[in-house]
Each structure stands twice: as structure tokens, then as C-alpha cells.
Amino acid sequence: MNEIKGIERAVQVEVPRPRFLLLAFTDINGSLKGMEIPMERYEEAVEDGVSFDGSSIPGFEGIEDSDLIFKADPSTYAEIPWEGIGRVYGYIYKGDEPYQADPRGILKRVLERLEKEGLKAHIGPEPEFYIFKKNGTWELHIPDSGGYFDLVGLDKAREIRREIALYMPYLGLKPEVLHHEVGKAQHEIDFRYDEALRTADNIVSFKHVVKAVAELHGYYATFMPKPIYGFPGNGMHLHISLWKDGENVFIGEDGLSDTALHFIGGILKHAKALAALTNPTVNSYKRLVPGYEAPVYISWGYRNRSALIRVPAFKGSGARIEYRCPDPSANPYLALAGILMVGLDGIKKKVEPDSYVETNVYEMDDAERERLGIDTLPGSLGEALEELKKDKTVREALGGAYKNFIDYKEREWEEYIEYLSSRDIPIDTKKVTEWELERYFYV
């Protein structure tokens, strides 16, 4: 009965005419930030922008040079029914010029490079999340005993998941499949693919609605890559295809097209540095360990879930690749910018993809992987940042934001190392620390 009432509440929401408008953007971490203005200022927000102080936004300017302007993108307007306000994404400017560290602007610039080649990227994400009962401590309370695709033992979680899906269309998302994931209290709601910029917006919107609905029910939802040691981590597999003149250019006859293979080649070539964007937290590397279906070996294959890149289909409009290492702590604008930049680089340079595998990579011994030329992803955020420093192409994707990003993330890594040292915890620990929970639980 409670479940039915919850669903009815979501369906019957009456959305009054919004009197306030949320101007929303992300910081360098991908966390949602914003300010509200009266709806009467909407046109001003589009035409002239609204100024704000960026000095306290993670990854933005210091206090000595922090005057920024938000300009609304009216194509992103939506209404948030549980708050009764409007919401719009946009771009950040510094004076009359696009601000170098604006994540959405970074992706836009990479997409303009694709467009010069006549290409558009379609991307479908699969973000996973956990739902925990609030109890005021870091002793995370698991509210259900379900497993993969289970239909029993879900109690409140099932109601929350359905209510999330019912709210999603208000924000422009089209839910496709809802199901329980492998971990207890772990869930996934897949939504329809879209062009790259809209997909990045949708990921931000999805995380917003998931957290908000869980909160309405007295629960926490977290997209933290590995909230509990020994439990499956939260991934965000990305299904990617490129289109030209309305045709999917990944389609081949007996396999993927050369364009698709070179795109894969570019990703594999830069995968180590790319990890700094697709897996940008200390906690990300607690997920990327063997045994949990999270890829650690740089390889690719057809329908092979142990590979870093899987090819689910190569015929028809559904021809695509699946990049399996990203997690939902990534800033989606930066992650997609990096992936598309290195993929385009692979196409231009005709990079052939090595490390093709048909069998389970995890079951190979070191000698077999070495024979096949299979390398590994970085084992920590620190290693990923060192790879990023050496990779010109991934740095180029970030553009002027590279310094902001590397400085911010190096401080993050240093703080973690200091925490471990102060408690005599080994630097290579795979246990989830309280430092990580405090820093990443709300990503």
C-alpha cells in the first residue's frame, strides 16, 4: 500500500508556475552547483548572464581573480517538480570570453572538433548507485537484501527506484530499464542515449533526481565508486557511437568499421592518462580491482565483459562500443571530452587497436597477458595523475583547465597520503577509509 501511495504521489505532482530559476553548473569534480534567481530575470540570464564569485567553487579561480558570469542555455530548461522551481544549465564566462575551467564549455569545445570532421557522438550511460538508510554514522545501513535482477526482499528500495523513474522525464531523461544490481542495496536505472553534451547534462540531472528522491524517503543515495569494501563498486559504463550525415559510422560488415577500430585504438593508447578523468578519485581505484567485473586490463573484444572495451553490436543502428572503466564520480563533461578527444586522435592517426581478447582476461596468467601486449590501468589516483602529465592529447582535451585540474587533484592525493600516514595505514590499502567516505559519499 505504501509503495502504491508513493508512486501516486510522483505521478500526480502538480507543478505550479515556477517563481524561481536555478542556474546550475558543475565544479571541476562534477558536483552540482548553482544559484537561484527570480524567474523574471531569465531573459537577462540568457542574454547578459548573471555574475558570481567563483573563488569558493572547487577547481575555479582564486580569490584574487574570481569574478565569473553564468550564461543560461535555454535549450536545457526544465522544471524540478519536487521543489517547484525551474532549472537551466549554461556556460561560465570570464568577462566576454568563455571561462577555461568551465567543464561544460570544455566538452563543447571538443565537440566542435568532432563537428569539423562531420561527426556527432551518441552516448548512453549506465550509472550505478547504492541506497542506504540514514543512521547518522559511517556504519552504512543496508536496507535490502536483493541481488542482481531480484524482485523480492527490496522493500522501500523498489518504491524509491520507481519514483525516481517517474520524476526523470520532468528533467528530460527517458528511463528505459530499472533493476537491482549485484550488490545488496545497489541499483541501476538506464536511460536513453543522446548526443554527447545532452548526455553529460543528463548524467548530472540523473544524479540530482536520485539523491533528491532518496532524501524525500529518509535515505541516502550514493554514486561513490566503492562505498563498502568487499561489495561490488558503482560503475558507469558508456555506450558510444559516432554518426555522420545521419548514419552510424561504426557499422561494419564482418565487424566494426575501420573508423570504429581506430577510435578504439585511440582510447586504448591513452587509457592510462584518460583514467584521471574517467576515474578521478582515490576511491575509484578501490573499485578497479580484479574479481568484481570492473576492468583493469587494457584490452578489447566482441561481447567480452572482462575487456576494458566491449563491442556489444556492430550491425545496424545499434553498432557501438562500451567503455567499461568509468565510474559515476567522474565529471561527465570532462570524462566525455577526454574520451572523444583520444578517440578522434585515433581516427586521424589510424591507430590500430592492440590487445584483442576473446577469453576472460582475469583468468590469464601474467605471461599470457604479456604475450598479448595487455597492459593495466593505473592502480591509484596518484599513478593516473602521473600518466596525465605525460599525455599531450588528454591534456589538450582539458585545454586551459589542465592546470586547475592537476593542481586540485594533486592536493586531493596528497591529503589522502597524509591521512594514511597519520594512521599508519599502508598506502596500497584497498579498504575503504573514513577519509574517502567523508570526501566522496555525496559525489
Swiss-Prot record:
| Species lineage | Archaea, Methanobacteriati, Methanobacteriota, Thermococci, Thermococcales
A GO CC annotation recorded here is: cytoplasm
Q: Which residues form the GS catalytic domain?
A: 103-443
Residues binding L-glutamate, per UniProt: 233, 287, 293, 305, 324
* Temperature sensitivity of activity: Optimum temperature is 60 degrees Celsius for both transferase and synthetase activities.
* Cross-referenced InterPro entries: Gln_synt_N, Gln_synt_N_sf, Gln_synth/guanido_kin_cat_dom, Gln_synth_cat_dom, Gln_synth_gly_rich_site, Gln_synth_I, Gln_synth_N_conserv_site
SUBUNIT field: Oligomer of 12 subunits arranged in the form of two hexagons.
| Keywords, alphabetical | ATP-binding, Cytoplasm, Ligase, Magnesium, Manganese, Metal-binding, Nucleotide-binding
Q: Where does Mg(2+) 1 bind?
A: 126, 237, 322
Molecular function in Gene Ontology: ATP binding; glutamine synthetase activity; metal ion binding
Catalytic reaction equation(s): L-glutamate + NH4(+) + ATP = L-glutamine + ADP + phosphate + H(+); hydroxylamine + L-glutamate + ATP = L-glutamine hydroxamate + ADP + phosphate
Q: What does this protein do?
A: Carries out the ATP-dependent synthesis of glutamine from ammonium nitrogen and glutamate. Exhibits both L-gamma-glutamylhydroxamate synthetase and gamma-glutamyltransferase activities when using hydroxylamine as substrate; in fact, the enzyme possesses low biosynthetic activity, suggesting that the reaction is biased towards the degradation of glutamine under ammonia-rich conditions. Might play some role in ammonia assimilation under ammonia-starvation conditions. Can also use GTP instead of ATP in the synthetase reaction, but not CTP or UTP.
The record's pH note reads: Optimum pH is 7.8 for the synthetase reaction and pH 7.2 for the transferase reaction.
Q: How's its activity regulated?
A: The activity of this enzyme is not controlled by adenylation.
Name used for this protein in its record: Glutamine synthetase
The record's remark on the cofactor is:
Binds 2 Mg(2+) or Mn(2+) ions per subunit.
Q: Which family does it belong to?
A: Belongs to the glutamine synthetase family.
Q: Which organism is it from?
A: Thermococcus kodakarensis (strain ATCC BAA-918 / JCM 12380 / KOD1) (Pyrococcus kodakaraensis (strain KOD1))
In terms of Gene3D superfamilies, this protein maps to:
Glutamine synthetase, N-terminal domain, Glutamine synthetase/guanido kinase, catalytic domain
NCBIfam families given for it?
GlnA (TIGR00653)
What's a BP term from Gene Ontology annotated to this protein? glutamine biosynthetic process
List required co-factors.
Mg(2+); Mn(2+)
Q: Which amino acids does the record list as binding Mg(2+) 2?
A: 128, 181, 188
**UniProt-listed Enzyme Commission number(s):** 6.3.1.2
Where does the UniProt annotation locate this protein? Cytoplasm
The GS beta-grasp domain covers 11-97
